[in-house]
Amino acid sequence: MARLVGVDLPRDKRMEIALTYIYGVGRTRSNEILAATGIDRNLRTRDLTDDQLTHLRDYIEANLKIEGDLRREVQADIRRKIEIGCYQGLRHRRGLPVRGQRTKTNARTRKGPKRTIAGKKKAR
């Protein structure tokens, strides 16, 4: 199993897909990385040479913010929004959807399970 920037890449997948196992790398960025390093995107991970693996590692470390660094940056951005008290920060603080989704119905993932209200009856 090839290990790249702290992530084990699956052996049997094509490189285009295998690179998406790294946090911060999707399909588009994966194809950009492979084009820049000159590696065929249909090549399987198990078929990579040590030289290609080293070239990939060097390119990713030099040009991309991924994994732990990216996670820390996202968390810092959220903390900053909460501290300055902007609308998005308030939504984060209250545990509600941040990007304008409706909350009268739905939004259960963000709001958690329904809480019953004592004394409230259904209207017929």
UniProtKB/Swiss-Prot annotation:
BP-aspect Gene Ontology terms: translation
Signal peptide interval: none
GO cellular component: cytosol; small ribosomal subunit
The keyword tRNA-binding belongs to this UniProt entry's keyword annotation: yes
Keywords attached to this entry: Ribonucleoprotein, Ribosomal protein, RNA-binding, rRNA-binding, tRNA-binding
MF terms in GO: rRNA binding; structural constituent of ribosome; tRNA binding
Gene3D superfamilies: 1.10.8.50, 30s ribosomal protein s13, domain 2
Chain positions covered by the region annotation Disordered: 95-124
InterPro entries reported in the protein's UniProt record: Rbsml_uS13_C, Ribosomal_uS13, Ribosomal_uS13-like_H2TH, Ribosomal_uS13_bac-type, Ribosomal_uS13_CS
Functional note: Located at the top of the head of the 30S subunit, it contacts several helices of the 16S rRNA. In the 70S ribosome it contacts the 23S rRNA (bridge B1a) and protein L5 of the 50S subunit (bridge B1b), connecting the 2 subunits; these bridges are implicated in subunit movement. Contacts the tRNAs in the A and P-sites.
Recorded family membership: Belongs to the universal ribosomal protein uS13 family.
Subunit annotation: Part of the 30S ribosomal subunit. Forms a loose heterodimer with protein S19. Forms two bridges to the 50S subunit in the 70S ribosome.
Protein name: Small ribosomal subunit protein uS13
